[in-house]
Amino acid sequence: MSEQTLDNNKAIVVFSGGQDSTTCLFWAKKHFESVELVTFAYGQRHDTEIEVAKQIADEQGVKHHLLDMSLLSQLTPNALTQHDLDIEVGDDGIPNTFVPARNLLFLSFAGALAYQTNAKHIITGVCETDFSGYPDCRDSFVKSMNVTLSLSMDKDFVIHTPLMWLDKKATWALSDDLGVLDYIRYNTLTCYNGVIGDGCGECPACQLRANGLNAYLAEKGVD
């Protein structure tokens, strides 16, 4: 590894302004002294996502980096970047919201930013418990990426995935433990149709989020 030691108290969070990455933000603030966020503009369906990410970063007093990754929308048509496509599940079981190589590229650029800011830790909200079958959300991919990033920059990075083995119910429980359940419920954007908070209630992302929240609140005894 190269001579300059990375700051073990500093973390970069891959941040979209959604439930998962915002939960990761508060998890990071609990575990590290210095936290910065990186958001990627890749031609997603709604500019609102970027505005929400900026707003949360501002409210939490966290430095926010916005990187242009619009080239992703040039590579393949999918329902996250093509507004005229309906969200559907393909024959392989993977929804057309899958953006090939998205997390590969996001973690690569988050690693480059970590290198420049001397941050040892990179945090992403990917999960393979309640997920849509995206191959780049799997634990095996993240572990491989951790090795690749470290070798490519001769730095001893650590990629954290606090939500990897949590379903949505458990993710809500974590946000409650962190004292931010209501903040995340009402200020984040998960909805594919761009509705902040509880969302449209119809898209797959909203249904997954709502089912997890309802299950957690029912277990907690809250109406």
Swiss-Prot record:
Q: Which CDD domains match?
A: QueC-like
Question: What terms describe the molecular function in GO for this protein?
Answer: ATP binding; ligase activity, forming carbon-nitrogen bonds; zinc ion binding
Residues annotated to bind Zn(2+): C191, C200, C203, C206
List residues binding ATP: F15, S16, G17, G18, Q19, D20, S21, T22, T23, C24, L25
Family matches, as InterPro entries: QueC, Rossmann-like_a/b/a_fold
Give the source's domain of life in one word.
Answer: Bacteria
Describe the reaction catalysed, as an equation.
7-carboxy-7-deazaguanine + NH4(+) + ATP = 7-cyano-7-deazaguanine + ADP + phosphate + H2O + H(+)
Give the GO biological process terms: queuosine biosynthetic process
Q: What role does it play? A: Catalyzes the ATP-dependent conversion of 7-carboxy-7-deazaguanine (CDG) to 7-cyano-7-deazaguanine (preQ(0)).
The subunit structure is: Homodimer.
Q: What is this protein called?
A: 7-cyano-7-deazaguanine synthase
- Native source species: Staphylococcus saprophyticus subsp. saprophyticus (strain ATCC 15305 / DSM 20229 / NCIMB 8711 / NCTC 7292 / S-41)
**Which lineage?**
Bacteria, Bacillati, Bacillota, Bacilli, Bacillales
